[in-house]
Amino acid sequence: MNPSVASLICACGIAGLLYLDREKTVHSSRALWLPGIWIVMVGSRPLSQWLGVSPAGNEQLDGSPVDAAAFGVLLAIAIGVLIRRKSRTRTLLLANWPILICFLYFLVSVTWSYHPDVSFKRWIKAIGDLAMALVIATDRQPVAAIRRLVSRIGFLLFPTSVLFIKYYDLGRAFDDDGMPMNTGVTTNKNALGLIVLVVSLVVLWNVRSLLINKNEPNRGRRLLAQGTLLAFGLWLFWLANSSTCKACFILGSFLIIASNLRAIRRRPARVHALCLIILLAAGFTLLLGGQADVAQALGRAPSMSGRTEIWASVIPMVPNSIVGAGFESFWISPSMEIFHRKLLDLGWYPPLVKHFNEAHNGYIEVYLNSGWIGVCLIALILISGYRRALKVFHRDPELGSLFLAYVGTGAIYSITEAGFRMLNPSWIFLLIAIVSASGVNAGLFGGGKHEVPASRSRRADFHELMPERERETVHAPGGGFNAI
């Protein structure tokens, strides 16, 4: 098929899926464009790459001015939205004190970074991840916001990835070892697998909800749209061939489905047992059985020696085991050069070593940049996030299962990938799940079904620009976490 014809069909297909998935009873804020654009940028390619703009100077240190400007504008607008929603924002920030402490420590760690200016700029971008999670969680209809936002991201990125892979060179590339890989709208196969993972979990959750709840409005056409999107996701998992992401999706899907079984959801102890079994199974699989995929991604033979060589070489390189090298600073410090020379001495492929800038383990990555203090803070976030998601599960098993899936897959994914880094979809969706779960547990959102009448939809965006106290005098606060 001619690529131009395929592009036209793809565009029409995306428009058709958006039309089928529309919900007339849901009127989310226009502010959702902010996290939508943010996630598309971090989940696909930098804006500078789409525009064909080459960064000036040292890309590792300076980055792209175009990308910095885009992220800065989105962050500034998001902060403005959160200020307008100050009551809900304050409640969520206080409820998520482990995340606040972690970000404050990251800010302090900028002071001992080898490049404090670069580290501080990266911390500002990291704040953007949290700000986007708060924009979603403070929406009038937060669950509907998650459904709509993630679905639209999938409608845009999934078909376009297939188009790029099948009909254009944009979706195919070669790794540093000369092996072909499918990248779709992203820069490498692991990035493609990751964005497919975080989107497909919500899509699967949507499909299950539509299958179970037969009274949903426009159920048939929405089920067709979500089912098609899920099929695209499964196809892209196969094309990307990222075993870590496939394993996380299987485990996350199993958690969503199994935890909603009557025999499990009525027994809290069984939910704990299910989560523990999944976590242990994933850990043993990735550490003992999944080494072939990780080694292949690193250009090594499928043996455990590849990963252990990386870890054994990089861990002693940390300048201070307690506080680390400084926020996002290890890979721009002299320790990186020492680490590269050590890998070369071990016989690693030089072009691969040259571009090596992560430990392929999220926990070790945090240790390198933030030391044991950072690792403990990440562990605190995961534990508190699990507890909050479990409390939501007791109130609403359907919603709680999604939050549990994101917390679980976030912890599992970081066993073999740097999943706790800024501008990483795994980290962003982990924040969304934890912040949203905190909103439920804090009683910030009502539990009944909430629909915005059509007569109010035209005023919704005007109200969004008003101070929160004034808006509450105009209409009752909305947004039920149990309502769709």
How would you name each of these model-derived features?
Residues 36, 221-231, 357, 361, ...:
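Loop-to-helix entry and N-terminal half of a specific, functionally important transmembrane alpha helix
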Residues 233-236, 242, 347-389:
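A conserved mid-to-late transmembrane alpha helix and its immediate loop/hinge
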Residues 1-3, 7, 75-80, 103-111, ...:
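Alpha-helical transmembrane segments of multi-pass inner-membrane proteins
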Residues 294-312, 323-370:
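Long extracytoplasmic/lumenal interhelical loops at the membrane interface
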